Amino acid sequence: MRKMMPDIDLIISGHTHTQLDEPIQHGDTYIVSCGEYGRNLGTISMTQKDDGRWDVDTYELIPVTDEIKADAATQERIDKLMGTVDTNYLSHFGYTKDQILAENDIEFSSVDDMYNEHEELNLGDIMSDAYVYAVENSEYYDGDPVDVAVVPSGTVRDTYTKGDVTVEQVYNSFSLGIGKDGLAGYPLISAYLTGKELKLVAEIDASVSDFMTIARLYCSGLNFTYNPHRMILNKVTDCYLMKAQGEGNREEIEDDKLYHVVTDLYTGQMLGAVMDTSYGLLSITPKDKDGNPIENLEDQAIMEGNQELKAWAAIARYMESFDDTDGDGIANVSEYYNEKHDRKVVEDSWNIIDLVKHPNKFSAIIAGIFVLVIVLIILLILLVRRIVRKIKNN
């Protein structure tokens, strides 16, 4: 941006999740950023120079903590607005913001974990399982079982702490977006992918998400193993279907078969960006149940009558569906989420056999390019030597 518009004096970065403890100076332009999730406020003081440009005098990030006393007038306004949340929004879904959905004793992974740890995480497990539960237990369920549900890290905004899980907390955990209905929250969408494309979903997580961490994928129904040391786009060594929570046996994926996939609208729209990142090598086309490509993903929103099934509402329903194990009339989050279930297994091996087993077409393409480059280098060396000999002989 600075290169395109050098006359800008100050760029306040947003949506990058980057905390800059000191401004970045690029020519006469300063770039600042407070970080993410409202954890800091930033203050900056600048003095104008004789040439019209500006110098930074002071710059400080101020952590937002409970120790900061709220402004009374502002807090009063916020409280009045919060009172409308129940009547103007949550009433559409039969909830109130302070309603307790479940009691939680599980230590769930954090949002930061989703970006920093490339493995199965229980926060992703419970969210993806919630998608399956909400669809298959809706009064509008059409009887078509969900084979796979997918949740990317890029949509998750908060975790679930120990104690009471309220509607407000669940909404905050998945608060992004808006649907075609004009109501806040991304809806769930229903689509179909071939078995070959399901394997590519696993490969996107294994190969692409280290460069594009919003594409870390957490699946219900799709289990896979990957080796981070293998060639890019050929890191997945095993991929198969398994019912949520391990019910039933392993099911091998048929490349040409259509599988029912549920995800949120954001994820569907994100596929284009992922394919661009892979330069078209990873191509996934969402389809209807007859195998026809879907032109508008918004039209695939899962509807309950005239209302979209929102992703956050799916999670809320799942939370309150758990058994009441302590008899106090409130659901308890299942102990199932206290451990991993081989949904995403990391095979951290440098063994030569592990590095080359199960090659796919991408490894063949990349290997072919590598060999071609080596051949061209050899030919270039031979050509240079030949030219040098001719020069010496002359």
What are these regions (language model features)?
Residues 10-25, 38-42, 157-158:
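Active-site environment of divalent metal-dependent phosphoester hydrolases
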Residues 6-9, 27-29, 144-146, 257-259:
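Loop/turn elements at helix/coil->beta-strand transitions in domains of secreted/extracellular proteins
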Residues 1-13, 118-119:
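Active-site-proximal segments of metal-dependent phosphoesterases and phosphodiesterases across multiple
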